[in-house]
Amino acid sequence: MKKTLLFSLAMLLLVNGMAQGQEKKPNIILFLVDDMGWQDTSLPFWNQKTMYNERYETPNMERLARQGMMFTQAYASSISSPTRCSLMTGCNAARHRVTNWTLEKNKSTDGETDVLNLPDWNVNGIAQVSGTDHTFVGTSFVELLRENGYHTIHCGKAHWGAIDTPGENPCHFGFETNICGHAAGGLATYLSEQNYGHDEKGNPTSLMAIPGLEHYWQTGTFATEALTQEALKALDKAKAYNQPFYLYMSHYAIHIPIDKDMRFFEKYKQKGLSDKEAAYASLIEGMDKSLGDIMDWLEKNGEADNTIILFMGDNGGYASGSGWRDEPLFTQNYPLTAGKGSAYEGGIREPMIVAWPHVVKPGTRCDKYLMIEDYYPTILEMAGIKDYHTPQPIDGISFVPLLKQTGDPSDGRSLYWNFPNIWAGEHGPGIAATCTIRQGDWKLIYFYETGKKELYNIPDDISEKHDVAASHPDIVKQLSADLGAYLRSVDAQRPAFKSTGKLVPWPDEVE
């Protein structure tokens, strides 16, 4: 009898131990890079290396790719706020209507156009509670993580709500710790010698001044490094809480101003780059070092085996004018055309890597396409959160089957973009008021101002040099119908003509 009781007790302890092991939730880190081009890395996301892969040094992106899966067709919006609002809400930008970048309350950031009256979009961003005009109300996945036992940390750029609105503060979206996140989508300077945009009395000299880094003022610490050190301190605290953590490491790099990160600048000067391009390269490598520092922390603290890392860019690399990059412009994302703000691939295709120990096969590559709003259901599925309810419909589709190589959620799926806006102060290929659809190999861009439609076969023409709309009218018609139907279904916005006051036709209303 005694032996039977001892055996039963031992089995009970074993079963309980196994159950606890099975219930252990993974830590999750989302490492989002600002304005990073598809080619701003030594890791080739194309089927061949380019001069940019040879130019830049990102050893930790390569390290992460060896541990996980690269995605060669990861898409986002061409501008920061729309991407970040889609990430947080799981909604396409056409639905949430934060279609351009946000900053000041009730103030549009649109540029001017002689032809179009631009729509009254959600200039105040997103919110989790109603009561603020020109916002989209939705529950963030971070709030759902927190409700399900995660310690949630925000570090760096937020940029999903205007000044003096609920969306300005990441803590209103489920983050328990907020490091430097506020309304601004850029930064005044990366330099501690300039107090990251504050005067000697501590007053911000710009709306873009980075808050919360006073400890690093006048220390010679580049902003990317300061944010990394603060993130590591937050992880040290999180480890003591004995609960899984979610870290949103959202760097301001590689956003303008293109300041010199002197830890790496001279290396690139010695490679023969100009001051501007060497500074740009130094921002990239500083970001990569941050990734490596976080990976090192995970290994040192025994958390690497239970931590998922997702790496993503928020929009295309900065390739236009304003004096930040050297000529020739619009080529810096080669083989993709153009960059940030453009409907062409250079504006919307992002570098992406996911490492998930014991789930994702190391050193793999996925050529299926996905969209930024897919992160919402994916991260919740990774965390084992299945039963959740949100006031907003979720447009995103989990890409966990791609990670596990058990299915293809992109099969038969269309991706959609709507940018009924003008990116102020910038001009170049595809930088205009547009709506776009990607379906299989085909991509259709509709220009609101002119009614022009461009059709590209992306696998055959990744640079979008050959518009084949005239030779494939049937495909143009089909994609126009799909795009028009989708935009109507989500109550998307569109401009109107100044000359008549009439709304611009939907793409399926124009031959």
Show where each model-derived region lies.
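Long, internal low-complexity/basic segments
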Residues: Q22-P26, V33, W38, M70, ...
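Short, solvent-exposed turn/loop segments enriched in Gly/Ser/Thr/Pro and often Arg
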Residues: F45, M70-C91, T99-N106, H154-P166, ...
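Short, structured active-site-proximal loop/turn typified by the sulfatase FGly-forming signature C/S-X-P-X-R
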Residues: K49-R84, G90-R95, H151-I153, F173-H182, ...
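A short beta-strand-to-alpha-helix junction
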Residues: Y52-T58, Y75-I79, D110, Q128-T139, ...
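Formylglycine-dependent
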Residues: L103-H151, A158-Q243, H251-K260, A278-A281
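Histidine-centered active-site microenvironments of extracellular/periplasmic hydrolases
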Residues: P166-G174, I256-R263, D296-V359, M371, ...
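C-terminal cap/loop subdomain of S1 sulfatases and analogous C-terminal strand-loop tails that border
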Residues: T177, H182-G185, Y318-E345, V360-T364, ...
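A long, amphipathic alpha-helix that forms part
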Residues: F222, A226-K239, E266-T307
